[in-house]
Swiss-Prot record:
Its main location: cytoplasm. The lineage of its organism: Bacteria, Bacillati, Bacillota, Bacilli, Bacillales. Belongs to the PAPS reductase family. CysH subfamily. InterPro entries: APS_reductase, PAPS/APS_Rdtase, PAPS_reduct_dom, Rossmann-like_a/b/a_fold. It comes from Anoxybacillus flavithermus (strain DSM 21510 / WK1). This is Adenosine 5'-phosphosulfate reductase.
Amino acid sequence: MITYETWDIEQKPTFPIDNNEKGALHVLSWAYDHYSDDLLYACSFGIEGIVLIDLISQVRDDAEIVFLDTHLHFPETYETIERVKQAYPRLRIHLQTPSLSLAEQEKQFGAELWKTDPNKCCELRKIIPLRQAMTGKKAWISGLRREQSPTRQHVEFINLDKKFQNIKVCPLIHWTWKDVWRYVHRHNLSYNPLHDRGYPSIGCAPCTAPAYTEEDLRSGRWAGLGKTECGLHES
């Protein structure tokens, strides 16, 4: 088994990439065969997440999925989660919350930490909760795509994740923005309506703004704060 402790780049499996959908299903099938219940999907319920959930359900209909509930998300995001639960009732969808409430965080670190120290806010409300959710897991799935941003251009299907000392599985690395939307429309999948209002990438409400450029689909995240990642995908 490929784990963080036994990682050997020469042992990584290869997958067909002539068809993105089949390729993603091959990656997911390998991952669930390889890790079974030791595999977790950390989903933001953005448009890539909607695609991955549909693909995962074809491979493992009772897969474990975690949403990092920072208590700062848009109402539309929570509504999307409820619709997904109804559409895929066997999936085990869990909302992982931070140990600090927003009031406790403000008391300890000051008001609007997402403005004064966004990295600390992401650490408290995303990174630490994901560590807790991944306790005992050997691998996790992410919806990263190479096209999303310059920091993601070298992501592979199977990655050594030094931050979480885990294996990170990324089935959608070769998918384009258009590929994602073609799949959504072809399968008539329900998605977050904020995508239709100029939000290609959706995170916490205070740190997410519309981004009307396909050149950088994440330009609406942490705008003006010199930050493009929450820290989950940084080594």
